Amino acid sequence: MTSQQTKYLETNNPLHTLYPRFFDIDMRYCAGANNHQKGVNRAKLSVLIAIRFSIVTPGIVRWLYGINHRLALEHLNRLEKDGLLRVVKTHRSPDGRVYVPTYTAAKFAEELMGIDVHFRSNKNPSLQFNQNNIMHNLINAFVMLRGIHNYHSDETYAPMWSGFITEPEFKRINNLSDTRTVDGAVRLLDGSVAAIEIEHSFKNKTARQVILLKYLASLKKS
């Protein structure tokens, strides 16, 4: 391969051109110096979670912000009142509900990220996402956010990765390629990129081996 061909591949490889923009989105929660700043920081992060993962729930923000269920509901209901979220009641969520972003939230997220948001609003908010994937999406969101918010036992900040790309973002980036879809990708602290695959349904060892071998084959082709 010539140096010109190598340069072409690098300049047209999403790993070098598109992924960094998403990896650089700040998804770490910082409480803030006062209650006002705390509220602003929570509002921004909750909107980003809803936009990037399609949904957000009281369970996610309760864990992330270290608050109880009542305060988590108050926080999300306030964002709903402000026109940033809409609530959908569903038994598929551990909280009995999920919150989906609005067009206003999409425009707000664009300002925060500096990235265009591909958003389609629907009069019926329950049609904005696949209810069969609620648990999968919530587990995915927890895992990716957990890696950003990792601490040692002495409270020393020790993130497992510095940023991530969600499944919807990954699909949009690789829309016209034959890249195998993953549940997300993370940028590790050494700058390397790792794929995230969430499997919350039971599969025996043989089934898991088949899946992993398919991923290995895809990696060797890329």
Language-model features, listed with the residues they occupy:
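Flexible, glycine- and charge-enriched loops at secondary-structure boundaries
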Residues: 69-72, 133, 205-209
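Nuclease-adjacent, charged terminal/linker segments that flank catalytic cores
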Residues: 1-122, 126-127
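Short histidine-centered catalytic/ligand-binding loop motif
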Residues: 128, 197-199
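Short, flexible loop/turn elements at secondary-structure junctions
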Residues: 54, 65, 188, 200-202
